[in-house]
Protein backbone atom coordinates (compact mmCIF):
# COMPACT_ATOMS: atom_id res chain seq x y z
CA UNK A 1 0.00 0.00 0.00
CA UNK A 2 2.80 2.36 -0.70
CA UNK A 3 2.76 5.27 -3.10
CA UNK A 4 3.89 4.84 -6.66
CA UNK A 5 7.29 6.13 -7.70
CA UNK A 6 5.70 8.86 -9.81
CA UNK A 7 3.52 10.06 -6.93
CA UNK A 8 6.51 10.11 -4.59
CA UNK A 9 8.62 12.05 -7.11
CA UNK A 10 5.81 14.56 -7.59
CA UNK A 11 5.51 15.15 -3.84
CA UNK A 12 9.29 15.49 -3.46
CA UNK A 13 9.48 18.02 -6.29
CA UNK A 14 6.52 19.98 -4.92
CA UNK A 15 7.58 20.16 -1.27
CA UNK A 16 11.36 19.69 -1.44
CA UNK A 17 14.05 22.27 -1.93
CA UNK A 18 15.26 20.42 -5.04
CA UNK A 19 14.47 17.17 -6.87
CA UNK A 20 16.67 15.06 -4.57
CA UNK A 21 15.51 16.55 -1.26
CA UNK A 22 13.79 13.55 0.30
CA UNK A 23 14.86 14.12 3.89
CA UNK A 24 13.50 17.54 4.75
CA UNK A 25 10.71 17.67 7.28
CA UNK A 26 8.23 19.13 4.79
CA UNK A 27 8.77 16.27 2.32
CA UNK A 28 8.49 13.63 5.02
CA UNK A 29 5.23 15.11 6.32
CA UNK A 30 3.80 15.42 2.80
CA UNK A 31 4.66 11.78 1.99
CA UNK A 32 3.14 10.57 5.25
CA UNK A 33 0.01 12.61 4.56
CA UNK A 34 -0.36 11.06 1.11
CA UNK A 35 0.06 7.55 2.54
CA UNK A 36 -2.44 8.29 5.32
CA UNK A 37 -5.00 9.57 2.82
CA UNK A 38 -4.48 6.45 0.70
CA UNK A 39 -5.02 4.17 3.69
CA UNK A 40 -8.19 5.98 4.74
CA UNK A 41 -9.74 4.95 1.44
CA UNK A 42 -8.56 1.40 2.05
CA UNK A 43 -10.28 1.27 5.44
CA UNK A 44 -13.59 2.39 3.97
CA UNK A 45 -13.67 -0.94 2.15
CA UNK A 46 -11.73 -3.16 4.58
CA UNK A 47 -13.04 -2.27 8.02
CA UNK A 48 -11.51 -5.27 9.82
CA UNK A 49 -7.94 -4.86 8.55
CA UNK A 50 -6.43 -4.25 11.98
CA UNK A 51 -2.88 -5.01 10.89
CA UNK A 52 -2.86 -2.11 8.44
CA UNK A 53 -4.68 0.08 10.94
CA UNK A 54 -1.74 -0.31 13.31
CA UNK A 55 0.55 0.91 10.53
CA UNK A 56 -1.77 3.85 9.94
CA UNK A 57 -1.61 4.83 13.60
CA UNK A 58 2.17 4.62 13.46
CA UNK A 59 2.23 6.94 10.42
CA UNK A 60 -0.10 9.43 12.10
CA UNK A 61 2.11 9.43 15.19
CA UNK A 62 5.26 9.94 13.11
CA UNK A 63 3.63 12.82 11.22
CA UNK A 64 2.56 14.42 14.49
CA UNK A 65 6.13 14.18 15.84
CA UNK A 66 7.57 15.72 12.68
CA UNK A 67 5.02 18.55 12.76
CA UNK A 68 5.81 19.23 16.43
CA UNK A 69 9.51 19.35 15.57
CA UNK A 70 8.90 21.76 12.70
CA UNK A 71 6.71 23.97 14.88
CA UNK A 72 9.47 24.12 17.50
CA UNK A 73 12.19 24.97 14.96
CA UNK A 74 10.44 27.23 12.42
CA UNK A 75 6.86 28.36 12.97
CA UNK A 76 6.59 30.06 9.56
CA UNK A 77 7.48 26.87 7.67
CA UNK A 78 5.08 24.94 9.92
CA UNK A 79 2.10 27.20 9.23
CA UNK A 80 2.86 27.27 5.50
CA UNK A 81 3.05 23.46 5.38
CA UNK A 82 -0.22 22.81 7.20
CA UNK A 83 -1.98 25.31 4.93
CA UNK A 84 -0.57 23.64 1.80
CA UNK A 85 -1.53 20.17 3.02
CA UNK A 86 -4.92 21.21 4.37
CA UNK A 87 -4.28 19.80 7.84
CA UNK A 88 -6.41 21.01 10.71
CA UNK A 89 -3.68 21.60 13.25
UniProtKB/Swiss-Prot annotation:
Give the InterPro entries listed for this entry. Ribosomal_uS15 (IPR000589), Ribosomal_uS15_bac-type (IPR005290), uS15_NS1_RNA-bd_sf (IPR009068)
Extract the Gene3D superfamilies matched here: 6.10.250.3130, S15/NS1, RNA-binding
Enumerate the UniProt keywords alphabetically: Ribonucleoprotein, Ribosomal protein, RNA-binding, rRNA-binding, Translation regulation
GO molecular function per UniProt: rRNA binding; small ribosomal subunit rRNA binding; structural constituent of ribosome
Keyword Transmembrane helix appears in the UniProt entry: no
The record's induction entry says: Part of the metY operon that extends to pnp, also has its own promoter.
Enumerate the Gene Ontology biological process terms. cytoplasmic translation; regulation of translation; ribosomal small subunit assembly; translation
Record-level GO cellular component terms: cytoplasm; cytosol; cytosolic small ribosomal subunit
The record, for HAMAP family, names: Ribosomal_uS15_B
Q: Which NCBIfam families match?
A: S15_bact (TIGR00952)
Q: Function of this protein?
A: One of the primary rRNA binding proteins, it binds directly to 16S rRNA where it helps nucleate assembly of the platform of the 30S subunit by binding and bridging several RNA helices of the 16S rRNA. Binds to its own mRNA, stabilizing it 5-UTR and preventing its translation.
Q: Which family does it belong to?
A: Belongs to the universal ribosomal protein uS15 family.
Oligomer and partners: Part of the 30S ribosomal subunit. Forms a bridge to the 50S subunit in the 70S ribosome, contacting the 23S rRNA.
Report what the protein is called.
Answer: Small ribosomal subunit protein uS15
Q: Which organism is it from?
A: Escherichia coli (strain K12)
Gene expressing this chain:
rpsO
Amino acid sequence: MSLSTEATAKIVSEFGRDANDTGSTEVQVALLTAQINHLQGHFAEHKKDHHSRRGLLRMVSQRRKLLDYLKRKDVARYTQLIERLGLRR
